[in-house]
């Protein structure tokens, strides 16, 4: 009877050990990502200033920290709708530029500017390349909240785009609020930002929402 009880006790403890191992693994992963974000933000603040953190990609980088710790489908969904498509395009443009050795769309031109410190370009690649993978992983783990993802991204853009225009400059062109790429708009600021907002909603947010809702809806 003693042997049987010991075996039963050992068998029952195995799931507990597995859960503890998973919790420890998740904790290490969350701490590592949080530390990485702290380092990136510190570098950005030193070299670019706080305004650079208004880029949608930087908002997603930082926003993923509470999304991970809270295991929040809501936060992950809003961030994914807002930046997943642009981040995928960034990676495609960057990869093709490396492979073809020629300018493709211009989206990642700054990554090949020799006058830009290599450290800044390396750090940029280290967060832009894995960011869409992280967003997709969170959606797979936590699910996609379709009721919040799209309206949350729309609200985020409604706040961030006018703010970016107000504190940016044609040279910084944060979130393209002064023109797409190197092209500068001649439209009045309010009208252009409104059109840019509509473009994000219609061409980025809605298609992304529909795709994610089909793939990851909880």
Label the predicted regions.
Residues 49-70, 74, 79-80:
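Loop-to-helix transition at the N-terminal end of transmembrane alpha-helices
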Residues 35-41, 58-67, 131-137:
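Hydrophobic, membrane-inserted alpha-helices
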Residues 80-85, 89-155:
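Membrane-proximal helix-loop-helix units in multi-pass membrane proteins
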Residues 166-207:
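Membrane-interface transmembrane-helix boundary segments in multi-pass integral membrane proteins
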Residues 42-50:
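Short, hydrophobic transmembrane alpha-helix segments
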Residues 210-218:
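Juxtamembrane boundary at the C-terminal end of a transmembrane helix
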Residues 26-39, 201:
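Alpha-helical transmembrane segments
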Residues 36-42, 84-93, 156-166:
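Aromatic-anchored segments of alpha-helical transmembrane domains
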């Amino acid at each position: 009877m003693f042997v049987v009880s010991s075996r039963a006790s050992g068998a029952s403890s195995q799931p507990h050990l597995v859960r503890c191992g998973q919790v420890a693994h998740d904790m290490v992963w969350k701490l590592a990502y949080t530390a990485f974000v702290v380092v990136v933000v510190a570098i950005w603040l030193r070299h670019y200033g706080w305004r650079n953190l208004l880029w949608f990609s930087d908002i997603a980088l930082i926003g993923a920290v509470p999304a991970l710790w809270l295991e929040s489908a809501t936060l992950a969904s809003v961030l994914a709708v807002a930046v997943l498509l642009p981040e995928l395009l960034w990676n495609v443009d960057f990869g093709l530029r490396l492979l073809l050795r020629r300018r493709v769309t211009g989206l990642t031109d700054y990554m090949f500017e020799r006058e830009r410190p290599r450290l800044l370009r390396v750090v940029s690649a280290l967060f832009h390349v894995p960011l869409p993978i992280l967003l997709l992983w969170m959606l797979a783990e936590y699910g996609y909240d379709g009721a919040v993802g799209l309206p949350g991204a729309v609200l985020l853009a409604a706040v961030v785009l006018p703010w970016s225009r107000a504190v940016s400059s044609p040279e910084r062109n944060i979130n393209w609020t002064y023109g797409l790429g190197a092209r500068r708009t001649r439209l009045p600021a309010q009208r252009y930002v409104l059109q840019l907002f509509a473009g994000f909603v219609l061409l980025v947010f809605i298609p992304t929402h529909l795709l994610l809702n089909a793939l990851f809806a909880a």
